[in-house]
Amino acid sequence: RDFPRPQLPVIPLGVDCAKFAPDAGTRARQRAALNIGDDDIAVLYLGRLSFHAKAHPLPMYLALERAARETGKRLHLIQAGWFANDFIEQAFRDGAKDFCPGVTAHFLDGRRAETRFAVWQAADIFTSLSDNIQESFGLTPIEAMAAGLPSVVSDWDGYRDTVEHEVHGYRIATLAPPAGQGADLADTHAGEIDTYDRYCGYASQFIAVDVAAAAAAYGALIRDADLRRRLGAAA
């Protein structure tokens, strides 16, 4: 008697889409609370706020500043997440002031469940320019799709499998040294000379996100409400 081979499908991380469904009332309240006007554009980053172990914010700051200048639109950058310590928080706040002074910066506590879900409603665009080797699947682009938002993300790891370029949003060219060039970093981590935290931070300094391409992607979405709707609906 033959024994039927069991099905063993691989099911990726998922989200409860109903929690992210667009709601006009919630959107109006969230935008009013943040003083985001009807004609303003809000760009959302959600996740850990860590320049060495998640995503260095400099490419995002520079690209949004350029997009704000080129489009003439009033832009808001919502960074909803959490900091590991006060030093990192101050670095993010100072960086926003120094590198995107023309963009209104909002920092929200993403550890609060009510914030983590409602803040999606305030946004017009989602972004995550991750540059870190610890980034694997990446759940937030899936949440952005559930919220009906177009995405601007780095061309990185799991993001490549979820965000189809010019269909759901834009994947921004992200460069790393050739294979094998990180052997010294791997050796110091494997030999317990460097912690995993330091290993991630050191490795991230060799990654470059194309700021000009990111600015162009932001600009295209900022200028064109129909494009935002079309890419958001495709997700």
Features from the language model and the residues they span:
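C-terminal "capping" alpha-helix adjacent to the active site of nucleotide-linked donor transferases
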Residues: 176-229
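Donor nucleotide-sugar binding/catalytic pocket of nucleotide-sugar-dependent glycosyltransferases
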Residues: 1-25
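Conserved catalytic-core segment of nucleotide-activated headgroup transferases in glycan assembly
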Residues: 16-110
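Short alpha-helical donor nucleotide-sugar binding micro-motif in glycosyltransferases
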Residues: 110-113, 118-123
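Acidic donor-binding loop of glycosyltransferase active sites
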Residues: 121-135, 149
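Short glycine/serine-rich donor-binding loops of glycosyltransferases
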Residues: 138-141, 159
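Short hydrophobic beta-strand element within catalytic cores of glycosyltransferases
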Residues: 150-153, 163, 170-171
